[in-house]
C-alpha cells in the first residue's frame, strides 16, 4: 500500500487534481482510499457525485466515540473509498488536530485494508502547522506531491511545504515525489515550474493544462474522466496517474532561500 499526501496552497485545485488523479489510477486497476484533510471537506465531492459527506469530526460530535466505519466511509466512483476528516467548530479548536483524530479513528476501525493499493491524503497546504503536517510527521504518508502553478504565492507555499518535508524526512521515511503543475496560463509557466522543481532536487512530474472541461465536470459533480472520458483533459489526468504509479524518484527536497526563489521568478519574467 502506497500512502501519498497531496499538498499545495489554498485555491490551487488540490482537491480537484487529487480526485481526477485517483479516477485515472482506478482505471488502471488500483484500489484507492481518499482521506480529505481540509476543514472545507470538499476532497471527495466529485467522487461521490456531489454528496456532502458527513465528516469524522461531525460524526464524533453527534454520536460520541461509538462510531461505525460505514458512518464515516462512503464508496464513490469506481469503488474509491472516501473519508472527510472535517474541521472543528469555527473559532474553537485546531483543524490540524482533526486530521490526527480522523486518521487514528480510521486505523482503529480497520479502514486500512490489505487490498488497498493507494491511500491519498488531500491536505490544506498554506499552513504547515503541526496538525496539517501530521501525515508527514507521523510517517503515515511516505510520498508527497505538491500542486503548484506559475504564480508567486503558489511557489512560495510549495517551498514552505518542502521545508516541512525536509524537517520530517530526517527522522521518518517521507520523500517528495514531485511537483504537479496545475496551469494558470502564466507566461513561461512550464519552464518556471521545471526550474523550480529541479532547484528543489525534484521533478515536475506532470504539467496539467488549464481546460474548461474541468469546470464543466465540476458543475456536474464529476471528475473529468467520468464526465467526458474521451476528452483531451481526461487523457492528461490518465497520464498524471501513470506517472505517479510508475514514479521512482523520491527525494529529500532542498528548499531555497527567499532570495533564490525570487531570483528564479525574475529569470522567468514573473517579477521584474
UniProtKB/Swiss-Prot annotation:
Protein EC: 1.18.6.1
Cofactor binding description: Binds 1 [4Fe-4S] cluster per dimer.
EC supergroup of this enzyme: oxidoreductase
Record PROSITE patterns: NIFH_FRXC_1, NIFH_FRXC_2, NIFH_FRXC_3
Keyword set, alphabetical order: 4Fe-4S, ADP-ribosylation, ATP-binding, Iron, Iron-sulfur, Metal-binding, Nitrogen fixation, Nucleotide-binding, Oxidoreductase
Top-rank taxon, per record: Bacteria
Family listed: Belongs to the NifH/BchL/ChlL family.
Protein name per the record: Nitrogenase iron protein 2
Gene expressing this chain: nifH2
Amino acid at each position: 500500500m502506497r500512502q501519498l499526501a497531496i499538498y499545495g496552497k489554498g485555491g490551487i485545485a488540490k482537491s480537484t487534481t487529487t480526485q481526477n488523479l485517483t479516477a485515472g489510477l482506478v482505471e488502471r486497476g488500483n484500489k484507492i482510499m481518499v482521506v480529505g484533510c481540509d476543514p472545507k471537506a470538499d476532497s471527495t465531492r466529485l467522487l461521490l457525485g456531489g454528496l456532502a459527506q458527513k465528516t469524522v469530526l461531525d460524526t464524533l460530535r453527534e454520536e460520541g466515540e461509538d462510531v461505525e466505519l460505514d458512518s464515516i466511509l462512503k464508496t464513490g466512483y469506481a469503488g474509491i473509498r472516501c473519508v472527510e476528516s472535517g474541521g472543528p467548530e469555527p473559532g474553537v479548536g485546531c483543524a490540524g488536530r482533526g486530521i490526527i483524530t480522523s486518521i487514528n479513528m480510521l486505523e482503529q476501525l480497520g479502514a486500512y485494508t490489505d487490498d488497498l493499493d493507494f491511500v491519498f491524503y488531500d491536505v490544506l497546504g498554506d499552513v504547515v502547522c503541526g496538525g496539517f503536517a501530521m501525515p508527514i510527521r507521523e510517517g503515515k504518508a511516505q510520498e508527497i506531491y505538491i500542486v503548484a502553478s506559475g504564480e508567486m504565492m503558489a511557489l512560495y507555499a510549495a517551498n514552505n511545504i518542502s521545508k516541512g518535508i525536509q524537517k520530517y524526512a530526517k527522522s521518518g521515511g517521507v520523500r517528495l515525489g514531485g511537483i504537479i503543475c496545475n496551469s494558470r496560463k502564466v507566461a513561461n509557466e512550464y519552464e518556471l515550474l521545471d526550474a523550480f522543481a529541479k532547484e528543489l532536487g525534484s521533478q515536475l512530474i506532470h504539467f496539467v493544462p488549464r481546460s474548461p472541461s474541468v469546470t464543466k465536470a465540476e458543475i456536474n459533480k464529476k471528475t473529468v474522466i467520468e464526465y467526458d472520458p474521451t476528452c483531451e483533459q481526461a487523457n492528461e489526468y490518465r497520464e498524471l496517474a501513470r506517472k505517479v504509479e510508475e514514479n521512482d524518484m523520491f527525494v529529500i527536497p532542498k528548499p531555497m532561500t527567499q532570495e533564490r526563489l525570487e531570483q528564479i521568478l525574475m529569470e522567468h519574467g514573473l517579477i521584474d
